[in-house]
């Protein structure tokens, strides 16, 4: 069995070598010639999977180690009877960490949030709902915006226009161009003009959900909107002038925690195992060894405030600085920063040795451990 895989998929050899012969390629450079004789294709969001790539190939299973699937031509895959699977929610913990870090840097993360501070989470799927639940549990007044859900899933569900009264808007939607509620350029000049003065807009979903040129034009003529962008239109060839105009920018790494990336690999491995079992194969399952390896090490920290606890695990300013320093090398440096991304650990990796007692329940609810006395 032949497998073509993105070289940046964590533990790709350890997980998939027992299943078949692996050819590793840079994600943006996977070609029809690479996949012509492959049975399995494993990708990330940087690889468009469509007729141009797969026509004439033997591929029968496509796995993407990402939550999003807008890079997969699902209609073509269905027509060709090619099975496919994604990793919904795999990086939710990392995205929560990213959002809280940005809030801490901007002075929006408080031990006791003001009741006058209102948050909107736009897109409440696997990741957005985790952000919504986390901020709500931390005491923030949160609303959810998602036309495909009802209040049984998100209690305070509101129409899109409700974001105009919010102080922080966190965007976690997929990119869609058709259907009953397309998200492409959902945030445009008209929306910017209606946002609350002094609001903060954070996008860790898909770049095209925000009209980047319209946003740049707005920021060049207004000083009442703070913007945090982890995702951009036309990645990796991003609008450099927009980077100059936003408060914080990064290279599509919000969910790029060590645990999140490994979760994506493990979920696709499980999906492939299930597919092969259903087709009479009996592949070796190596997930347990990987899971045990990830879980065994912990790091101890001391904190004095909630913001301090978050920034001790991850400071988004580090990634912002790396992107700004690499701006002359764009677009290649955008991908290089992602490829060489450090081992960023989620809250569950850390154990609190000392912290104000009132913070301990809050920190434990986020997954921090506590050093036994």
Curated annotation (Swiss-Prot):
Gene Ontology CC entries for this record: cytosol
Chain positions recorded as substrate binding sites: 45, 66, 256
Catalytic activity: 4-phospho-D-erythronate + NAD(+) = (R)-3-hydroxy-2-oxo-4-phosphooxybutanoate + NADH + H(+)
Residue numbers binding NAD(+): 146, 173, 230, 255
GO biological process, one term: pyridoxine biosynthetic process
Keywords: Cytoplasm, NAD, Oxidoreductase, Pyridoxine biosynthesis
Enzyme Commission (EC) number: 1.1.1.290
Annotated catalytic residues: 206, 235, 252
Domain of life: Bacteria
GO terms assigned for molecular function: 4-phosphoerythronate dehydrogenase activity; NAD binding; protein dimerization activity
Pathways involved: Cofactor biosynthesis; pyridoxine 5'-phosphate biosynthesis; pyridoxine 5'-phosphate from D-erythrose 4-phosphate: step 2/5
Leader peptide range in chain numbering: none
CDD domains tied to this protein: ErythrP_dh
Cytoplasm keyword on record: yes
Places the protein is found: Cytoplasm
Chain's role: Catalyzes the oxidation of erythronate-4-phosphate to 3-hydroxy-2-oxo-4-phosphonooxybutanoate.
Oligomeric and partner information: Homodimer.
Protein family per UniProt: Belongs to the D-isomer specific 2-hydroxyacid dehydrogenase family. PdxB subfamily.
UniProt name for this protein: Erythronate-4-phosphate dehydrogenase
The species this protein was found in: Saccharophagus degradans (strain 2-40 / ATCC 43961 / DSM 17024)
